[in-house]
């Protein structure tokens, strides 16, 4: 099944930045965010909404790796941590939402200095809507490859294929989704920019309200998407949502970057 406003078609183009990070060019479009009532093991915070993404954006082909993190930040936050395999191609973990945001800011500065990024562009975390739109890649099924969870092992690392390997694996080893994105299902949870709310936001370019306007009880929670190497298939579904304090760091938390034009003043007030 395909989403309204987009088709699976050919895999989108990609670009490579100055640190060797490949980004997939995601087209603008419309889609239904969340899961249908009949989806197996869906939960109430996935109630469907109609979303329009009015602008194209770039999204990391893989999760940010340890090697990429070290190039930009010069640190190893995962060093000495539990359940981590040190490898430049493994995802950077033990990073909070704040850490990931700082990485995006520093990468923006590096790219501008290298002449690879225009003054009106930036790197940032994807919004929750952008993340799910890119994960689905034109599909409406539980996963980007269909509804059969038995196929999940071909596309991601989850609790069913990491029992003897208790760590996140090298990025890009599993099959990509229809738009060429790897590890959207499993491996590590991925931070999104949004504050967490119990209901999804629809409309055009939705972003959960910023600090000071979010109603309790979630004033510090940010959205996590994608599942990780130690969860059941239900946690790796395209619509699955999770949340945690923005300062939390753990062995199963990572992120991928988005690249887009800077938000306008009107957009920042959303």
Predicted segments with their positions:
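Surface-exposed recognition segments
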Residues: 41-52, 139-145, 162-167, 184-270
